[in-house]
Amino acid sequence: MKMYNIPTPTMAQVIMVDDPITTTEFVISALRDFFDKSLEEAKALTSSIHRDGEGVCGVYPYDIARHRAAWVRDKAKALEFPLKLLVEEIK
């Protein structure tokens, strides 16, 4: 059997930044729908983001992190929320 050298994907974290306009309900919903958080995890992370100014939603292969962040940005924009998400490569 031939062995292939498959490179390890570059990993990235999605960071959600707190703002005074985006609702708590939207943040909890986004964390549950796009980042697969349980209700309890989403509530705890939402509180942490509000308290600390930002929080890590998850760590994924870079392309998946970019897509998840884009989906949430699009949903927020459609609802006229200024939610900011960052995708930071993990080295």
Swiss-Prot record:
Q: Which Pfam families match?
A: ClpS
- InterPro entries in UniProt: ClpS, ClpS_core, Ribosomal_bL12_C/ClpS-like
Question: Looking at the record's lineage, which domain of life comes first?
Answer: Bacteria
Q: Which GO terms describe its biological process?
A: protein catabolic process; proteolysis
Function, as annotated: Involved in the modulation of the specificity of the ClpAP-mediated ATP-dependent protein degradation.
Quaternary form? Binds to the N-terminal domain of the chaperone ClpA.
Entry similarity comment = Belongs to the ClpS family.
What name does this protein carry? ATP-dependent Clp protease adapter protein ClpS
Annotated source species: Helicobacter pylori (strain ATCC 700392 / 26695) (Campylobacter pylori)
